[in-house]
């Protein structure tokens, strides 16, 4: 009888151990990641005793089919930043400071070089978010995933003090401000890939100065941790919404009270080139608004009297913004988000 082994079924324990060793080398070089316990059964984190009435807040997310763009471009250095960003940007909406992050990588066949690029991005994202990479899991799934493909999931825990869920005091005429995104972030890529496939588009085609389509699509998701937490602490903003899958249309209502609705002026939008390029293939305005962030990765709501403080704070973080609308009484409008004007898709 032929002897069977785990490696003969397509899973290499030795390669997995080597990958963990490579990650440990990276971790040891970075003093900011000293809390990490890569290779252990679990990770531990000591909560700061100075935090009054601590409440732990958790978030989990992935990066969708943006991974396929990274694979097509053979560039996996920033996809890990996206993974961290998608989780921490959700946490900060609820005023939680990111504490630690864990990752999960699933692949048909482990490629150590590719894996190091992915982990390198995750580490960079954690540093940008001021949180620890506490651990993770890398799994080979032969015959389930194809050899050159992989998927990612991230898990982040943060902390805040006070009540578990306080409803913000939103009022009519409060200002709605869009904070600029770096691009598509990590949503809408299935539609983008359909456009690329059906139109036989080459990712090395230049559409913006010296930037190719592939480079614009791979721009890592903006991490808003520092500016948003700063503005919450200084009571500059009342609430915010992370604009992900579902676009402004689906995400902004999640941060609104039942007594108010959002009125958005599309004429105020400054659309980056990549969104104009996508729309040029016949994507309607409504579809754009409920699929993509359309240039604003985070939307904040504030009292008009706080505008000067907001401008000073956001400029110190070198982020661009636009006042895109205001809140109205829900009795005056039958939608949680209504739009006036049209997006300018022309150059």
Predicted regions and their residues:
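Glycine-/charge-enriched secondary-structure boundary and capping motifs
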Residues: 2-9, 25, 114-132, 145-152, ...
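N-terminal basic, low-complexity leaders that serve as flexible interaction/assembly modules and, when applicable
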Residues: 7-13, 28-32
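Glycine-rich phosphate/pyrophosphate-binding loop regions near the starts of catalytic domains
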Residues: 27-182
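Short, glycine/serine-rich, charged loops/turns that create anion-binding
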Residues: 49, 105-106, 183, 247, ...
């Amino acid at each position: 009888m032929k002897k069977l082994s785990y490696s003969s079924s397509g899973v290499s324990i030795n390669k997995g151990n080597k990958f963990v060793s490579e990650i440990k080398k990276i971790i040891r070089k970075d003093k900011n990641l000293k809390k990490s316990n890569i290779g252990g059964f679990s990770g531990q984190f000591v909560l700061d005793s100075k935090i009054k009435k601590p409440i732990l807040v958790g978030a989990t997310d992935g990066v969708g089919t943006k991974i396929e763009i990274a694979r097509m471009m053979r560039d996996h250095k920033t996809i890990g930043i996206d993974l961290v960003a998608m989780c921490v940007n959700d946490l900060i909406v609820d005023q939680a400071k990111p504490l630690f992050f864990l990752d999960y990588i699933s692949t048909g066949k482990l490629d150590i070089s590719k894996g190091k690029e992915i982990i390198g991005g995750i580490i960079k994202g954690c540093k940008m978010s001021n949180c620890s990479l506490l651990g993770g899991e890398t799994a080979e799934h032969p015959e389930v995933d194809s050899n050159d493909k992989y998927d990612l999931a991230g898990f982040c825990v943060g902390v805040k003090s006070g009540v578990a869920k306080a409803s913000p005091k939103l009022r009519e005429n409060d200002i709605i401000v869009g904070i600029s995104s770096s691009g598509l972030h990590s949503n809408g890529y299935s539609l983008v890939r359909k456009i690329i496939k059906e139109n036989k588009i080459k990712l090395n085609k230049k559409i913006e100065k010296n930037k190719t389509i592939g480079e614009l699509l791979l721009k890592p998701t903006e991490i808003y941790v520092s500016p948003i937490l700063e503005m919450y602490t200084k009571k500059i903003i009342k609430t915010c919404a992370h604009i992900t899958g579902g676009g402004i249309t689906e995400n902004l209502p999640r941060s609104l009270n039942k007594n108010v609705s959002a009125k958005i002026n599309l004429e105020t939008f400054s659309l980056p080139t990549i969104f104009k390029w996508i729309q040029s293939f016949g994507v309607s305005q409504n579809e754009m608004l409920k699929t993509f962030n359309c240039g604003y990765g985070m939307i904040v709501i504030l009292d008009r009297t706080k505008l000067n403080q907001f401008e000073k704070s956001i400029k110190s973080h070198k982020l661009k913004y636009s006042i895109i609308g205001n809140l109205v009484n829900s009795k005056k409008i039958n939608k949680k988000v209504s739009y006036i004007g049209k997006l300018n898709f022309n150059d």
